[in-house]
């Protein structure tokens, strides 16, 4: 992974302004591409990494308690965990400054459940293959998703280009 790819992801990225006051939860496996975001977003912006073990993360009530006790401001969840936790710990998730999720097709009702809690400050759907250094596009989600059949993949993050190509590699 090139240094510039990590910088593009977490500094002047157009979707989140991280600072020294941010406390970013590290809930992913270190081998998972999301750990690039979870580690470098706080470190390159003077913030704090809050490492949570897998046993805590898979138990909704313990996870919620840890997020609150550790005053986590930023969290990235895989879509599967996001869908599960919007049903069980939505009030805790609603307290976050940034909640990002991605990794597979997202569930509109899960986003709506969380939005009914009037939080988090920024709810961001992320898309992009691992090869783009975690994600390449983002879409901030607001109440207006209620009429949509699916969650949009959004627009490219700063310093990123996205090309739509056909099966032969030609532009669409």
Regions found by a protein language model. Name each.
Residues 1-172:
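Motif- and composition-driven signal specific to adenylation
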